[in-house]
């Protein structure tokens, strides 16, 4: 509807961003890297229309953590590559320093979004915001409690998390 309205009003638009909840509103389905079949029954068709009919690209937000009911969470959990400390929204963050976590992350991103026609993704919250993350002193405390990453202490390497995730 937004894109159609912009086109009807002759307002220039090259890209539209859906920030979150394309996976659903339930926190347990957070960032499953799949479209909710109820709210997005045919994402490939919608994206195709955005491209061919409206000449607009689609960007989706993708997060480094996952709700407990998602396949990616279950796969990351089985591989033991999730930090123990939950974020402000209650999901757990992947140890993206671990090659196994990188592979799982990319496979879900590729299969769940890229193959549907999504043009780009916005890697949101790549500085994992743990509980009370809005307060710097609390963020530091929780970061130190996150434990060990594949390459060492989370407290020591957390600042490079965004860089590693974008690779």
Give residue ranges: language-model regions:
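Carbohydrate-interacting/catalytic domains
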Residues: 1
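Aromatic- and carboxylate-enriched substrate-binding clefts and catalytic-loop regions
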Residues: 12-167
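Ser/Thr/Asn(+Pro)-rich, low-complexity disordered segments
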Residues: 4, 8-9, 27
